[in-house]
A protein has these predicted regions:
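Short, flexible, glycine/charge-rich loop motifs used to bind or transfer phosphoryl groups or to couple energy/partner
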Residues: 1, 31, 61-62, 97
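Short glycine-rich, Thr/Ser-proximal phosphate-binding strand/loop in the N-terminal lobe
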Residues: 2-57
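Short beta-strand-loop/turn "lid" adjacent to the catalytic site in phosphate-handling enzymes
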Residues: 62-120
């Protein structure tokens, strides 16, 4: 798979005070690191009225033409179906709405504690 054809992946960790974003490219399991980070950013949640505004700010800083096809968002709050609401901030995140808005074929939401467990 050539680097230009390799899929891009957006990961986010959204808490009550900060939203962390990563855009990376898949390099394959043979590489020292299977993902090549392209852009990283941490934002203060207080600077944005809702999650989509923080996400828009991150995407605006990403390399031109960098369009992820997969997004996984871990957040501090319960996930019910394809929607989630942060426990300590009045933000609601809807996976289907994000998929439609950004034309992303796959958007997954998970509780941040569950995401931490997957990382162990």
């Amino acid at each position: 798979m050539t680097p230009t054809a390799a899929p891009l992946f957006l990961a986010a960790d959204v808490g009550g005070t900060r939203a962390r974003f990563l855009l990376a490219r898949w390099r394959g399991p043979e590489a020292d690191s299977p993902w090549e980070p392209l852009s990283r950013r941490v934002f203060a949640d207080d600077d944005f009225p809702h999650f989509d505004a923080a996400l828009d700010a991150f995407l605006a800083e990403c390399p031109l033409g960098a369009e992820p096809k997969l997004a996984v968002i871990a957040l501090a709050g319960p996930v019910t179906g394809r929607r989630a609401r942060l426990t300590n901030r009045p933000w609601t995140i809807d996976a289907d709405a994000l998929s439609a808005r950004y034309d992303w074929p796959r958007v997954e939401l998970m509780n941040d504690f569950a995401a931490q467990a997957f990382g162990l």
